[in-house]
Curated annotation (Swiss-Prot):
Residues that, per the record, bind heme b b562: H83, H182
Full protein name: Cytochrome b
Miscellaneous information on this protein: Heme 1 (or BL or b562) is low-potential and absorbs at about 562 nm, and heme 2 (or BH or b566) is high-potential and absorbs at about 566 nm.
A molecular function GO annotation: metal ion binding
Amino acid sequence: MNNIRKTHPLMKIVNSSFIDLPAPSNISSWWNFGSLLGICLIAQILTGLFLAMHYTSDTMTAFSSVTHICRDVNYGWLIRYLHANGASMFFICLFLHVGRGLYYGSYMYLETWNIGVLLLFAVMATAFMGYVLPWGQMSFWGATVITNLLSAIPYIGTNLVEWIWGGFSVDKATLTRFFAFHFILPFIVAALAGVHLLFLHETGSNNPSGLNSDTDKIPFHPYYTIKDILGALIMITALTSLVLFSPDMLGDPDNYIPANPLNTPPHIKPEWYFLFAYAILRSIPNKLGGVLALVLSIAILTIIPLLHTAKQRSMMFRPMSQCLFWILVADLLTLTWIGGQPVEHPFVVIGQLASVIYFMLILLIMPITSMIENQLLKW
């Protein structure tokens, strides 16, 4: 009798994806983040589902319904903070996952990479709309500022913004549709993640050396299942520690003030994971220019495979490129810091410099350095 795991139509998909999958023998802990992102997504969908059972998407009751969840629902506070901080864990894993892809040249798998960029956009959209739902001051003003950016689009801008708002300002219609989109998008993300995996399994995983690993493969289970479980336990420990000890550390205190269209907060800023893009947006004095830079700061990832000039895939044996990669990481951390600062001297200048360095590194300095390294290989 054949093993049901290998014959059953559904089981054999699971088997070929998570059990008998041939994996390179040398992939490091940087390859753990795919599974961690899957765990994050499942956790977000589950906690979100339970929150949606008690949440009301009406401007009059949204804020108090979130308060009700925290005070009156059994373990409502836990579900709410797991969901809010789960988003932060999601983005930490996302950024590390993308960073891994950049460092080890995983972007050479074009379909997998481009679907990944699409996933990044989808998760960012989901997180933005989720931030609007508690209807606090930062929710309202964040929604107003970010949706208003679309008015920079020539000719159709103003009509587009009013169409998204469902009126002449951010109001009940906006909140209701944002809730609807926030509910449906994670399922679209899950479907995209399935396609992401499908394309990845067409080629097999990359590995730290960037070399073909067909000659040395090991089964995914038990080697990488146990490794992924360890990674998951570390992440879950970090998340529960954050939720139980300082759940509001990453949030904005202004969001505990109910939304008031007549009173603008002194510093409007998004959640920490959007600050780098927000800093790039603010560093350009022109509205349309800022919006384009904001979109390009993420969309630039799609052209990274075209900018790969090195003869080696991975940065493992390219010390000059490694150095530039870590400069890029430092630059993104600088942008994140600047995004949370007020618009005044010297933060404006630092933000502008960091933005220029960001685009220069990716578009010019890194490809040229790779070409220099190619020449050094001949020595």
